[in-house]
Design a protein with these regions (language model features):
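Short amphipathic beta-strand/extended segments with alternating polar/hydrophobic composition
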Residues: 22-24, 75-81, 166-173
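Acidic-basic catalytic patches of nuclease active cores, encompassing PD-(D/E)XK
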Residues: 12-57
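Long amphipathic N-terminal alpha/beta scaffold segment
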Residues: 52-70
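N-terminal intrinsically disordered, cationic/polar leader segments
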Residues: 2-3
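Short polybasic amphipathic segments
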Residues: 6-8, 65, 156-161
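Conserved catalytic cores of phosphodiester-cleaving nucleases, focusing on short active-site segments
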Residues: 65-67, 72-87
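Feature captures the catalytic cores and cofactor-binding loops of soluble hydro-lyases/lyases
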Residues: 83-140
Length: 181
């Protein structure tokens, strides 16, 4: 695995969460920089005191990110891509909140069409799609050592570095009922 470091300054006005975490991210040999950067983006969107990266692509049954409380109970379960219904149901059964961060329009549109009916029944689930051009622009910002300012307001995400700025307008395919996203 290749190791990346990300120094972040996060201002999430939607959630009232502010922090300056330093993340160490292991990139699996088969993982693209786009997916790596989307994991960082997911971390920023769901930032929390105990949020951490899962063991990676080769670890079945473990999310891309998760947050546990002091008792070990799972608060937040984050999946990337287009997980099957069984995986999402399992996540919902084990955690308080589930986020699916979908990307790759060619894959996401048919996936969502096929799972929408089943996944719409899961109250604690949020599904966000990141448009291809914005995911590609974010991937282009990947460096082994990164420094970003991330601002989230009105569900829009701005990622700024010394060399580039990306505005991400996530498309909410499904919002969790009775919770901010």
């Amino acid at each position: 695995a290749m190791v990346y470091k990300a120094q972040l300054s996060i201002s999430n006005l939607d959630r009232g969460w502010y922090g300056q975490p330093v993340l160490t991210i292991a990139r699996h040999p088969s993982e693209t920089e786009k997916r790596l950067m989307l994991r960082v983006l997911a971390w920023c969107v769901r930032a929390g005191e105990h949020l951490e990266f899962g063991r990676g692509l080769s670890s079945d049954g473990e999310p891309a990110l998760w947050e546990t409380d002091d008792t070990g109970a799972i608060i937040e379960w984050v999946e990337l891509g287009a997980p099957d219904v069984r995986t999402v149901r399992k996540a919902a059964g084990k955690s308080e909140h589930v986020l699916v961060l979908a990307y790759d329009e060619a894959r996401t549109k048919p996936w969502w069409k096929s799972v929408k009916g089943e996944l719409s029944k899961i109250d604690k689930l949020t599904v966000i799609f990141i448009p291809d051009s914005e995911a590609d622009a974010l991937a282009a910002m990947a460096l082994r050592s990164m420094k970003f300012a991330v601002t989230i307001q009105d569900s829009v995400i701005w990622v700024n570095s010394d060399t580039a700025d990306v505005q991400i307008n996530p498309e909410y395919l499904k919002r969790e009922t009775q919770r901010w996203t």
